[in-house]
């Protein structure tokens, strides 16, 4: 492993070309020939600007406005307005089935793209189970909170599984609110939903974006062995900002432990994944250090996206990180050994284009190692 200062010097420097947010989901694998990796290193080594120039210049981030001095969002943060026939259809279907989506609850900027089908032509949504009310209150999240949310619907696992199975999609993301009020943190409900969906549609690939279950190994094991294909748990921000960004019951070590346990308990071939928001006040060095620890925990996939303030009640955006800087983190992740890195201002943990690449990666793994097939 290279020293952190060397990694920063090599990767966090302005490139000679500009990157759009669409470049964030360019498929990346770390299985390269030595020759191609040497070519990458040579290209990076030939770029002369220093780390100091990168961090303090306009290449890394742009200023965020204040109430007295408002500034428009940078051009790469412009969102598409939700609409179109498919968007209307999927919204109606979700309402009819009384299903919650994190897309709406968290005010995801990609809602219009994913629900309308985007470039792939297939509409997707991330389903949220265990209700729409969380027991925690993270400073970045728009989901409703309560110490005593309504009890989970016992029929939800079956209803959700039947609804998703009827959509005709082949990759789905299921997530949930935190349920600290339940004895098993909601892990049994989560596992039952995955198991029921796999029973109805065995060929469907399922990504479970889970809470930390308060670090309970039994809960992590239960979900990890439920039949999912990808277990995701988000660390959300760098280690140094955990207490500022997340609820006091969440912390960096606990989240890393969840990811480690998931890799230990899940069947061979199951991928683990995590996500980090940038623009919360972190430094490049803190990001690199966090990436190193995440990779050491055996995580396969990592995503980076720009934090966007959902309302004035939430923590403000510290800075808008440029597409160029996001691309640097993607390259660094590739060099560190992550199997896939999605990094761009509009990338979110459950990002449509990233899901399609992970799907193809899983299918390729199963062709190479038939024993890992379900």
Curated annotation (Swiss-Prot):
UniProt transit peptide range: 1-19
Catalytic activity reported: [[Fe-S] cluster scaffold protein carrying a second [4Fe-4S](2+) cluster] + N(6)-octanoyl-L-lysyl-[protein] + 2 oxidized [2Fe-2S]-[ferredoxin] + 2 S-adenosyl-L-methionine + 4 H(+) = [[Fe-S] cluster scaffold protein] + N(6)-[(R)-dihydrolipoyl]-L-lysyl-[protein] + 4 Fe(3+) + 2 hydrogen sulfide + 2 5'-deoxyadenosine + 2 L-methionine + 2 reduced [2Fe-2S]-[ferredoxin]
Subcellular location: Mitochondrion
Record flagged with keyword Cell inner membrane: no
Expression sites (tissue/organ): Expressed in leaves and flowers, but not in roots. Expressed in roots, rosette leaves, cauline leaves, stems, flowers and siliques.
Keyword Mitochondrion: yes
Source superkingdom: Eukaryota
EC number: 2.8.1.8
GO-annotated biological processes: glycine catabolic process
Signal peptide, first to last residue: none
Pathway: Protein modification; protein lipoylation via endogenous pathway; protein N(6)-(lipoyl)lysine from octanoyl-[acyl-carrier-protein]: step 2/2
Phenotype caused by lack of the gene: Embryonic lethality.
NCBIfam families, sorted: lipA (TIGR00510), PRK05481.1 (NF004019), PRK12928.1 (NF009544)
Described purpose of this protein according to its UniProt entry: Together with LIP2 is essential for mitochondrial protein lipoylation during seed development. Required for the lipoylation of mitochondrial pyruvate dehydrogenase component E2 proteins in leaves and roots.
Protein name: Lipoyl synthase, mitochondrial
Organism: Arabidopsis thaliana (Mouse-ear cress)
């Amino acid at each position: 492993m290279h020293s952190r200062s060397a990694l920063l010097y090599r990767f966090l420097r302005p490139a000679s070309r500009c990157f759009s947010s669409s470049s964030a989901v360019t498929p990346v694998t770390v299985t390269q020939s030595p020759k191609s990796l040497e070519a990458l290193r040579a290209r990076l080594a030939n770029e002369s600007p220093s780390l100091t120039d990168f961090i303090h210049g306009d290449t890394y981030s742009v200023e965020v406005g204040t109430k007295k001095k408002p500034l428009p969002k940078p051009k790469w943060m412009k969102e598409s307005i939700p609409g179109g026939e498919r968007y209307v259809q999927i919204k109606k279907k979700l309402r009819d089935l009384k299903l919650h989506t994190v897309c709406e609850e968290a005010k995801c900027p990609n809602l219009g793209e994913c629900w309308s089908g985007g470039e792939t032509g297939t509409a997707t949504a991330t389903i949220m189970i265990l209700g729409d009310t969380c027991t925690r209150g993270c400073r970045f999240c728009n989901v409703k909170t309560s110490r005593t949310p309504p009890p989970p619907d016992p029929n939800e696992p079956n209803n959700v599984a039947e609804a998703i199975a009827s959509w005709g999609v082949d990759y789905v993301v299921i997530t949930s609110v935190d349920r600290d009020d339940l004895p098993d943190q909601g892990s049994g409900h989560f596992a039952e939903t995955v198991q029921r969906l796999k029973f109805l549609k065995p060929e469907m690939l399922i990504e479970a974006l889970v809470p930390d279950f308060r670090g309970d190994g039994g809960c992590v094991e239960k979900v990890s062995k439920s039949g999912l294909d990808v277990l995701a748990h988000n660390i959300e921000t760098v280690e140094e900002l955990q207490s500022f960004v997340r609820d006091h019951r969440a912390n960096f070590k606990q989240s890393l432990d969840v990811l480690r346990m998931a890799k230990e308990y899940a069947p061979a071939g199951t991928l683990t994944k995590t996500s980090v928001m940038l623009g919360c006040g972190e430094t490049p060095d803190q990001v690199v250090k966090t990436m190193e620890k995440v990779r050491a925990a055996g995580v396969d996939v990592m995503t980076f996206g720009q934090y966007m303030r959902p309302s004035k009640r939430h923590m403000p955006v510290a800075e808008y990180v440029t597409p160029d800087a996001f691309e640097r983190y993607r390259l660094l992740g590739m060099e560190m050994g992550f199997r896939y890195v999605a990094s761009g201002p509009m990338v979110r943990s459950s990002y449509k284009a990233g899901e399609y690449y992970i799907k193809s990666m899983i299918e390729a793994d199963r062709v190479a190692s038939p024993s890992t097939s379900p």
